[in-house]
């Protein structure tokens, strides 16, 4: 009887986590979109973000748990400068959408001090080719301020694929492209892989990172973003 109650409670908790993750897709999007309409404040560092649901922070318990919020808070503290984020990412976005839709929004900003990009897992999930992914990404890199840009390589794709075989290979090819255009790379794969088997790294859908998982993303982005913004 007690065991059945415990199992039932666990099921309820898992369902609640999954529902929260689904809800966060729309709630985080609306929040970021509202902030993206705000004028740039005086005496702030401006960080623009492009990408998919990981850039939105889907999976985190609150939006403040997103890696963008976590890493900009850290860098803001270390540099003693306020940071204003313009997050143009879209949940479910592939690299092509980042190039065609999000990039023009970035170029509409009157100024930007750093650009953060994380996109690619949806290309894999939707079975797009590596060549089309790299072509879209190259379009992005040709049109961003390269000395102000840091991109993520691809993470292992959830606890069902802790080795992240395809994401590793795609990430290696992306690194070659980043080297060609002389942009910084945040080592997401390297930071996530040791914890890829740990379900606590993932949110309620066991695919997107949790707040804890996003702290690992923030670890990967912290140094390159700091290096860009302290110039």
State what each model feature region is.
Residues 84-86, 148, 182-184:
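Conserved beta-strand segments of alpha/beta enzyme cores
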């Amino acid at each position: 009887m007690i065991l059945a109650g415990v199992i039932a409670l666990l099921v309820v908790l898992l369902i609640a986590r999954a529902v929260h993750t689904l809800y966060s897709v729309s709630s985080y999007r609306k929040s970021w979109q509202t902030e993206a309409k705000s004028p740039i404040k005086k005496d702030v560092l401006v960080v623009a973000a492009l990408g998919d649901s990981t850039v939105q922070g889907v999976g985190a318990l609150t939006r403040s748990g997103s890696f963008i919020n976590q890493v900009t808070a850290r860098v803001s503290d270390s540099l003693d400068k306020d940071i204003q984020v313009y997050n143009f990412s879209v949940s479910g976005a592939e690299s092509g959408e980042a190039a065609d839709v999000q990039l023009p929004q970035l170029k509409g900003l009157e100024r930007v001090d750093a650009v953060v990009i994380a996109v690619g897992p949806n290309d894999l999930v939707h079975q797009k080719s590596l060549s089309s992914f790299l072509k879209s990404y190259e379009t992005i890199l040709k049109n961003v301020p390269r000395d102000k840009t840091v991109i993520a390589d691809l993470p292992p794709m959830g606890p069902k694929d802790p080795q992240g075989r395809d994401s590793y290979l795609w990430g290696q090819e992306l690194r070659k492209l980043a080297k060609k255009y002389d942009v910084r790379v945040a080592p997401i794969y390297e930071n996530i892989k040791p914890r890829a088997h740990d379900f606590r790294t993932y949110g309620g859908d066991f695919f997107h990172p949790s707040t804890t998982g996003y702290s690992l993303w923030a670890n990967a982005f912290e140094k390159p973003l700091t290096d860009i913004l302290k110039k």
